[in-house]
């Protein structure tokens, strides 16, 4: 069964696939997935329940998807009304929620047709913000950016102190779950990259651009050359999980499969520049984030682009970034002002912005033959934080929750509301 079909938009927001995510209690989980498998069979009415531990390859290989993601404690299945009622009433089940479609949280002036509304909105808002900067928001005063790209460095690497850090990310594994990577890109030559696709019928090759750009920011070329450096943790090991298709969208099931694969493949940090404009917390993503932290893995996600601050709308952090156990990253511009599109904290538990990173007019890799591009979004801020997390992890050995605290404690305080920027601007280790 393909994961890409959609059948409607629900009252709580987001596009639904018609399937459900069943979050199992910890009592069913362990080294033996037999109890969880039996419970899922009973709850769904399925005669045969495939566990992710049954698969010799990664989930999604050869079109085979597990019903049970054993490491995350989440099952994915269609439920009729009777089984849905029974699952929601079962004490072994923490939650049952509809499966949604998530989208890349950015926009690009060079992207092709078929992009989502959220994708295009991110670029439109960013473009409006840059225009407002140029004219001083109508006040007749031009704004001079505090940072700017140079021939040697992007403004984002300068603003976050990456240029002064001695760490390179060596020995740290960063998984980027996105639209894949342009595996032919010369800037990634010489790297040993493990790439997997969790999108039916599509290879890990990035035909969209978003994943290549985010991977470029998080890591970039293995050895920064004579051109402008844009990658943060250039010696980190990269895992590429294609969880969003060439149209920039993907299902919860595919994304959760990617998270589980990243954890079991040894990732220390998982970077996810994706989401949906849904304010309620997803129990499935919260369970995944919590179990990742328990395993010493930090998941970092883009806060969202649903704000239009110039029109008085501050937006809200969407799923999955609003999960209490997933770090949410907002965006600032080169003057360290909050980006017009960057979502603010919401009142739901976990719905706060934890950090901000460079997210306006960010220069990074782009699929060939273009090679590079500058685009905007909280998607661009997220991999800055993920790459810097790798630098800190290399320096201190911090993992999981300890690494989360390291990032927030070392952030640069900004003269902006904490609801917009959290602990402040993510900063690389200093001397």
What are the roles of these predicted feature ranges?
Residues 21-22, 76, 173-176, 216, ...:
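Structural recognition of the beta-strand scaffold that forms the well-ordered cores
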Residues 163-194, 202-253, 265-269, 279, ...:
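Subtilisin-like serine protease catalytic core
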Residues 28-29, 83-84, 100-104, 180-183, ...:
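Solvent-exposed loop/turn segments at secondary-structure junctions
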Residues 14-25:
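Short glycine-/aliphatic-rich beta-strand segments at the starts of folded cytosolic domains
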Residues 68, 229-233, 240, 259, ...:
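C-terminal subdomain of the subtilisin-like protease fold in secreted/lumenal serine endopeptidases
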Residues 178-180, 297, 318-394, 398, ...:
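Extracellular S/T/G-rich loop segment that most often corresponds to the catalytic His/Ser-adjacent loop
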Residues 15, 206-212, 248, 375-387:
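Short glycine/threonine-rich catalytic loop with a Thr-x-Gly-x-Asp
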Residues 4-11, 52-151:
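Autoinhibitory propeptides
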